[in-house]
């Protein structure tokens, strides 16, 4: 999200003293300057940056550091609090008690609006056991209608469309259909444009006045620049938005402009999309995003995702086998399947706490490596995955797997070598646990 973690700037530029002391202006001048540069580089709006720096300075200058307090952690806590305030302070969840709940989705072309509409329907279905209806109102792009229908079928959600018929008439008919079929969440996927224009605004107004939506959500691409602020301001002026959904936060986008919207327009970000998978939509928690910007990770969201998508029994079984030294390639394949459910390597990495940035190239390399391994593992028989020693006894099996997977012999050799190392390491950790020793001591934990 940001090229430099703010916590690393504090470590590098904050002038700390050893004894009890009061933080002075000169102690934070350089660190605030570097934070300002980082925020601007991330495309955070200038007015937002000025307000943020001013608020941090007011909170920190004159702060007395008591004996036993870590001044660095004091400053980080103040920065986190002010970042959280800028981002909206508290999560803004949609009230699902309304029946039916009507949501109008708007956005420019390419923002991910149609995919996000399907993700939102899937979210309400799985999280609240609702019966959603997806309505295609983008009559100018037949491909958008087809896309929404395909996504609806993929997650078994009801779909309504009337081709190129006037979208206001279609919206009205959809309401009747929803009533007849007892749909309790109605999502209108409206037309997108390359830019906001009078014709589009008039159409959206007419739809809004007919369906009286409970939520009007503007879908924003995280890769958008400062112009998105003008777009959001214009839509809000005419339609009275209730919030935003930011998409593509799993990309290497700076996202600063999108994250500036709440402070500038006093409207909440309701959800974020962090992947292409239909389940990759999360409630926007300002404090958790502040942690990511600081470099503290977002373990809570990662744990929640794991609880939602991972098969607990399979995960426990594989882990138990690993710790007693019985890990085989079938276990490895199962663990990789489970990991894939959490999202891309990049998505997971960005939720882990660290003060050094893994380059996007390294993350893509890891993603590609995992895909190659999955291809080779699926080219093996169950016997080969359960007993990889057969590759040494019968080398012809390697030739078959290499040909079947379309990979090179070296790729298979690397897979087998790294699996052997991982098996040995997990077995060592299991023995340490068995004898009451800390298996993570070797990592300084």
How should each PLM-predicted stretch be described?
Residues 46, 141, 145-149, 229, ...:
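Short, surface-exposed alpha-helical segments at coil->helix boundaries
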Residues 171-174, 183, 195, 199-209, ...:
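Conserved phosphate-handling catalytic cores of large alpha/beta enzymes
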Residues 106-107, 189, 219, 273:
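Short beta-strand segments
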Residues 132-144, 154-211:
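Switch II (G3) loop of P-loop NTPases
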Residues 24, 65-66, 70, 109, ...:
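Flexible beta-alpha connector loops of hexameric P-loop NTPases
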Residues 113:
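Conserved lysine of the Walker
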């Amino acid at each position: 999200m940001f090229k430099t973690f703010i916590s690393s700037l504090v470590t590098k530029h904050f002038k700390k003293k050893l004894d009890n002391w009061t933080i002075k202006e000169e102690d934070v001048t350089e660190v605030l300057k570097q934070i300002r540069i980082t925020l601007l580089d991330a495309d955070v709006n200038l007015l937002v940056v000025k307000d943020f720096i001013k608020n941090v300075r007011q909170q920190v200058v004159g702060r007395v550091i008591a004996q036993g307090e870590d001044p660095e952690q004091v400053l980080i806590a103040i920065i986190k609090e002010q970042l959280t305030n800028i981002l909206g302070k508290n999560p803004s969840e949609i009230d699902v008690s309304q029946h039916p709940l009507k949501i109008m989705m708007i956005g420019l072309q390419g923002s991910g609006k149609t995919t996000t509409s399907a993700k939102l329907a899937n979210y309400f279905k799985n999280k609240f056991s609702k019966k959603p209806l997806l309505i295609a109102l983008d009559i100018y792009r037949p491909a958008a209608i087809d896309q929404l229908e395909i996504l609806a079928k993929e997650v078994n959600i009801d779909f309504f469309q009337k081709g190129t018929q006037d979208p206001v008439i279609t919206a009205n008919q959809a309401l009747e259909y929803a009533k007849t079929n007892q749909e309790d969440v109605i999502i209108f996927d409206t037309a997108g444009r390359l830019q906001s224009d009078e014709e589009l605004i008039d159409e959206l107004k007419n739809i809004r006045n007919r369906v009286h939506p409970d939520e009007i959500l503007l879908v924003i691409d995280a890769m958008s620049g400062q112009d998105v602020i003008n777009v959001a301001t214009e839509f809000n002026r005419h339609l009275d938005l209730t919030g935003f959904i930011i998409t593509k936060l799993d990309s290497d986008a700076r996202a600063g402009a999108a994250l500036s919207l709440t402070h500038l327009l006093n409207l909440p970000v309701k959800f974020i999309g962090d992947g292409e998978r239909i389940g990759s939509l999360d409630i926007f928690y300002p404090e958790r995003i502040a942690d990511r910007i600081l470099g503290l990770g977002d373990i809570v969201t990662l744990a929640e995702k794991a609880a939602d998508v991972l098969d607990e029994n399979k995960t426990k079984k594989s882990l138990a086998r690993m710790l007693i030294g019985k890990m085989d390639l079938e276990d490895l394949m199962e663990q990789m399947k489970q990991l894939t459910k959490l999202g891309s390597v990049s998505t997971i990495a960005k939720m882990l706490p660290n003060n050094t940035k893994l380059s996007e190239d390294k993350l893509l390399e890891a993603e590609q490596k995992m895909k190659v391994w999955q291809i080779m593992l699926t080219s093996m028989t169950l016997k080969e995955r359960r007993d990889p020693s057969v590759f040494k006894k019968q080398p012809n099996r390697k030739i078959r797997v290499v040909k079947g997977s379309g990979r090179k012999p070296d790729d298979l050799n690397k897979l087998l070598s790294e699996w052997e190392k991982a098996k040995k390491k997990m077995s060592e950790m299991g023995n340490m646990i068995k004898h009451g020793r800390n298996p993570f001591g070797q990592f300084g934990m």
